[in-house]
Regions:
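Sec/Tat signal peptide C-region and signal peptidase I cleavage site
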Residues: 24-28
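Bacterial N-terminal signal peptides that target proteins for export
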Residues: 2-14
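Bacterial N-terminal signal peptides
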Residues: 11-23
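N-terminal secretory/targeting leader peptides
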Residues: 18, 29-121, 130-332
Length: 332
């Protein structure tokens, strides 16, 4: 059987498929295609990282292990995919950390505003013992194995009302947040009227003027054409979003030690490629979004940092005071 065709068992009923998959994976030397879920498409910062992972996996395993990527949430929304990996229904996937805070409080760290100053700060923290500790908590609380701390990037505000030069400029603006209490608190502290809303409804809400404002990394803002319904891009850089590449823990543990080592090595080889691509896309889309007619503003960030201090103080006990402090003050 060639390594890029599906084994017959994937067409069998799910329970049967799972037990066969586990059995097949348990025998080193058996060929295995790993289904991988992605929220965005193949040209995104996520796609570039996952495809590099697949390439290295095939090379290191001499064709025995390969991936089948499923783009644009085809296997379910991020929360369902994270749950699916834990239950053994989804093999592997990349997800923002947003839904993970619902399972493990410590992951709310990545919802907190102005924790990381720049990419180097975030990478150094995630690649340290703190990243390992969070990965351990994911194994215990979600039954998933974090293979590599890939990224979505820093999040920025867009709106259709005005430039943001100061938090006061957010007053009276109806802002959409992800379904996270931390994010609602953050945007209310900055002066906006914050409303949590499912991702699938956001574009229409902005188009119809039900919402004025949203926030996302630049590649996502470009990818979903927010420039069609938003006039202002404000480089608020308020949150750093990792996008961990993960595998169901039971599936990972079913591989031989040799294959586990290959999977981890492939992920580590893909990591710098993914992060570099993410930063390059950020620069490219900043230029392209301006060319598409968005007014780009780079506000002084100190007043924003100051305005959200109460949010960090409120949530630090939930996330863990030590973890929050370690992140903010991490030497890099």
């Amino acid at each position: 059987m060639s390594h890029n065709t599906h084994p017959v068992f994937l067409k069998a009923p799910l329970a049967m498929a799972l037990s066969l998959a586990m059995a097949a994976a348990a025998q080193a030397g058996t060929e295995r295609v790993i289904d991988v879920s992605l929220p965005l498409g193949p040209d995104s910062q996520q796609g570039i990282g996952v495809l590099k992972f697949g390439e290295e996996l095939e090379r290191l395993s001499e064709g025995r292990l390969s991936i089948d990527p499923h783009y644009d949430n085809a296997l379910g929304a991020e929360r369902e995919v994270v749950e699916g990996m834990g239950f053994g229904i989804v093999d592997a996937g990349i997800s923002s950390t947003g839904p993970m805070g619902g399972f493990v409080d410590e992951f709310l760290l990545f919802d907190l505003p102005y924790i990381f100053e720049n990419h180097d700060h975030a990478y150094a923290f995630l690649d340290s013992e703190h990243g390992e500790h969070l990965a351990q908590l994911a194994e215990e609380g979600m039954n998933v194995k974090i293979l590599a701390w890939m990224e979505n990037g820093f999040r920025h505000n867009t709106n259709s009302v005005r430039e943001l030069n100061h938090p006061d400029d957010l007053r009276g603006i109806n802002h959409r947040t992800q379904e996270s209490r931390v994010q609602v608190d953050t945007w209310e502290a900055l002066g906006a009227n914050a409303t949590p809303m499912a991702w699938t409804e956001v574009y229409t809400a902005l188009q119809q003027g039900v919402m004025d404002s949203q926030e996302n990394p630049l590649p996502t803002i470009y990818d979903v054409n927010f420039y069609e319904v938003q006039d202002y891009l404000n480089m608020t850089q308020h949150v750093y979003s990792p996008a961990p590449l993960m595998m169901g823990l039971d599936l990972f543990n079913s591989f031989s030690e040799e294959d586990q080592a290959i999977i981890l090595e492939a992920a580590q080889l893909a990591l710098p490629v993914q992060r570099e691509a993410s930063q390059e896309l950020e620069q490219r889309y900043l230029v392209q979004l301006a060319e598409l007619g968005m007014t780009v503003t780079e506000p002084e960030l100190d007043p924003f940092r100051e305005a959200v201090q109460p949010v960090i103080e409120k949530w630090a006990p939930t996330v863990g005071e030590d973890l929050v402090e370690a992140a903010i003050n991490f030497e890099y």
